[in-house]
Amino acid sequence: MAAKDVVFGDSARSKMVEGVNILANAVKVTLGPKGRNVVLERSFGGPTVTKDGVSVAKEIELKDKLQNMGAQMVKEVASKTSDNAGDGTTTATVLAQSIVREGMKYVASGMNPMDLKRGIDKAVAAAVEELKKISKPCTTNKEIAQVGSISANSDSSIGDRIAEAMDKVGKEGVITVEDGKSLADELDVVEGMQFDRGYLSPYFINNPDKQVAVLDNPFVLLHDKKVSNIRDLLPVLEQVAKAGRPLLIIAEDVEGEALATLVVNNIRGILKTVAVKAPGFGDRRKAMLEDIAILTGGQVIAEETGLTLEKATLAELGQAKRIEVGKENTTIIDGAGEAASIEARVKQVRAQIEEATSDYDREKLQERVAKLAGGVAVIKVGAATEVEMKEKKARVEDALHATRAAVEEGIVAGGGVALIRARTAIAGLTGANADQNAGIKIVLRAMEEPLRQIVTNGGEEASVVVAAVAAGKGNYGYNAATGEYVDMVEAGVVDPTKVTRTALQNAASVAGLLLTTDAAVAELPKEDAPMPGGMPGGMGGMGMDM
């Protein structure tokens, strides 16, 4: 095991604070509408230009081990805030830096770090309650667009795209972001449930122009096993033919004689059918078949439920208004399932999301909720160059997370104003002793820091603006984009409550840990091994002359 360097007290803390400051100073220049860009070097390809706080934070690794510890702790603030709320990473970093900076002064003057932390925690809890009180719900398209625009660094076109997508697929719908092929942003919406399996034979196509099979008002047969024997299918096919409606078969696979017979019937116009494989694999396949059954008001023909293909009746088949089957995708539009059953299924899947441990599982479950609840929208980001595309895509993703957070917990005035207003809840607080009161004071000072930084990045005098905003009431604040004092909500400068709350809580949590640190253990830098000796010189007089 390598030897370690153990550093105590002020020496450890001051080194870690240096690391905090290096990281925070690099991140905070991106804050606000007039924030600057940061250029990140890449080991291959061109550099990346970004205004995203967490992207900058993730790139920073410092040579000095103790400085790096401090930087990594603040990096944790940014990434945790990004994971929970999807935005607010720069605000969280600015808050953490301020709490650490002010707190260190008090620790150096001999105050008890534990009491300081208790005071900080008390103040943050009161501020969070106040933020929840002043929060207002975010329901209209206009408000959603405003949140998206602010989060995408005041790019209103991105906000409008996200609001349009949410309007089309609902608040629960899945919205994904992809690279576009043109200069303009595009929005593709898939209504109904879509899964990534296409027709098993091109002979099922009945719309040659679009190369798809379209079934109007069809029955849907769901089976969890392979179908290879046509005899198993005959009874149900006869019932469907009598009803004079088309049929979609979703099974593990349809092959051999069964597939050939379906194709022949289709070509001759006796019975319009399409066969597709069931989506997903293993347990996920069973769950998705069950989802389709609930959406279409049918049942999965499976041994577990005591149903067999030979005895299947029309009552066990699902129904839909329209189904489109392409080469790679199947879309079920307007399934005949009961709203109450679908709602119950959505609740059940949501409960599984809460318990999911891996990001992959959570993502797949969220997709299932969206497919049951309404649809999928894809925002295709357009840009002139690849570098711009990457930067813009990151902003769209940020904005998307922020709008979700806004719909979830509501919105507050943006531009650092909400934190200034939440200070009123802390102003009257007192701790159990003078050290706790100092902790409360630290948070009071830190909560004006985001506004200070926004103003500084805009090239104005921070103290004057902070005093003017603090003297105002409600949503009165400073719009750094225009340099005017306005009602922030009316001007469309709003932040999701969840983002502001999460930033403050995470910043206080990590800053409190730093303040209460009294020793740091780091690996000693490896000493370079001395150069190996050269070859000895030859001895004189050893020539080989004969």
Curated annotation (Swiss-Prot):
GO molecular-function terms, A-Z: ATP binding; ATP-dependent protein folding chaperone; isomerase activity; unfolded protein binding
EC category name: isomerase
Keyword S-adenosyl-L-methionine: no
Record: residues binding ATP: 30-33, 51, 87-91, 415, 479-481, 495
A GO CC term assigned to this protein in UniProt: cytoplasm
The UniProt record lists the keyword Nucleotide-binding: yes
Compartments, as annotated in UniProt: Cytoplasm
Chain segments carrying region Disordered: 526-546
Keyword entries, A-Z: ATP-binding, Chaperone, Cytoplasm, Isomerase, Nucleotide-binding
Enzyme Commission numbers on file: 5.6.1.7
PROSITE patterns: CHAPERONINS_CPN60
Swiss-Prot/TrEMBL catalytic activity: ATP + H2O + a folded polypeptide = ADP + phosphate + an unfolded polypeptide
Assembly, per entry: Forms a cylinder of 14 subunits composed of two heptameric rings stacked back-to-back. Interacts with the co-chaperonin GroES.
Function, in words: Together with its co-chaperonin GroES, plays an essential role in assisting protein folding. The GroEL-GroES system forms a nano-cage that allows encapsulation of the non-native substrate proteins and provides a physical environment optimized to promote and accelerate protein folding.
PANTHER family (UniProt xref): 60 KDA HEAT SHOCK PROTEIN, MITOCHONDRIAL
Protein family according to the UniProt entry: Belongs to the chaperonin (HSP60) family.
Protein name per the record: Chaperonin GroEL
